[in-house]
Amino acid sequence: MGKNVVVLGTQWGDEGKGKIVDLLTEHATAVVRYQGGHNAGHTLVIDGEKTVLHLIPSGVLREGVQCLIGNGVVVAPDALLREIIKLEEKGIPVRERLRISPSCPLILSYHVALDQAREKARGEFKIGTTGRGIGPAYEDKVARRGLRIGDLFHRERFAAKLGELLDYHNFVLVNYYKEPAIDFQKTLDECMEYADMLKPLMLDVTAALHEMRRDGKDIMFEGAQGSLLDIDHGTYPYVTSSNTTAGGIATGSGFGPMYLDYILGITKAYTTRVGSGPFPTELFDDVGAFLAKRGHEFGATTGRARRCGWFDAVILRRAIEINSISGLCLTKLDVLDGLETINICIGYENEEGAVIDAPTDADSYLGLRPVYEEMPGWSESTLGAKTLEELPAAARAYIKRVEELVGAPIDIISTGPDRNETIVLRHPFG
């Protein structure tokens, strides 16, 4: 019987999911993306060579692994085709192994224009989106007016829907945001070109997944962003527009929760966040700068510098409950090498002095102060360690304390960017 494993982020994204998915796909028949879009940036380093993926599942670098994009993913055809071509230039036969649900909503030029116009209009109160049209595309989907990939293959139907959508969105762009209108004919011609290239990649992904399940194949589900960016469970409104938590798998791929065997939560050994929104343990001192520099904390998608802070056990406990996490993978442990002391946030203190748990929205974080537990750091290098015994005693104590505070086992420890720089204590497919 096959095993079905989920890999998802438990913080605000950028936890190192891509490397771990790539590592574990050695055992998988297929890797599935089920939410998000090309706002994701998954960085893989194999034998020193760096590859950044945005839409295509991280299993693409493993020979023979099928890569599936489920109906919950919003697809920008131009971005997808650029990514395919870039990988093909490296000799990877992407089109042989990539298949996409025709039910995926499309991201088109007017979504990007709306996204960027809104952020510009918000000024200092901007959400901090990637400006790639993700939110507006999900809005069209929920409003039941969006175009889907399957519409591309019916020109007359597509043109009629596109005309209605442009009438609606151009009115907002021109009259409210004072931005130029999107041209109908140019958009239609571009989309028809995309149709010819995308048609061979279409597949009923839900049916394919259940066929694999019945055949006893191992399947991996690859999450994008992080649990605290979930549209329902994140620090609203500073969130993404999809369900980044485990519940998104059922809706975004048609694969029910009863069939999931193991959910691996990825967490950094410290905390980072890109863009706006609450971040109780954020550091503005030399330690924050140290983490940013040592951790190369710049977004793979936007290039924006990430905000850095101490490990937050409070938000991780919340993510573990929401996702029913089976085990954790602790990444970037090596970034903490050289720190004399390390703090772990164990609670938040409000203005009355009471220690509380994680709030449910962004405004409720105002006035909260992190309560820290201090632990000794270590001077020895953990970079590239492959067994627990190779780690300094203080690093092992830090790992054990994190497990105790969050109530979940750490099954994998990442000690460097390469897929081989990993300690596996319990294998999700084992």
UniProtKB/Swiss-Prot annotation:
The note describing how and how many cofactors are bound reads:
Binds 1 Mg(2+) ion per subunit.
Q: Name one Pfam family in it.
A: Adenylsucc_synt
Disulphides: none
The UniProt entry annotates the active site at: 14 (proton acceptor), 42 (proton donor)
Q: Where does substrate bind?
A: 300-306
Enzyme Commission code: 6.3.4.4
| One GO term (biological process) | 'de novo' AMP biosynthetic process
GO cellular-component terms in the record?
cytoplasm
Keyword DNA repair belongs to the record? no
Give the cofactors, semicolon-separated. Mg(2+)
Q: Where does IMP bind?
A: 14-17, 39-42, 130, 144, 225, 240, 304
Q: Which family does it belong to?
A: Belongs to the adenylosuccinate synthetase family.
Q: What's this chain's function?
A: Plays an important role in the de novo pathway of purine nucleotide biosynthesis. Catalyzes the first committed step in the biosynthesis of AMP from IMP.
What is the name attached to this protein's record?
Adenylosuccinate synthetase
Provenance organism: Pseudomonas syringae pv. tomato (strain ATCC BAA-871 / DC3000)
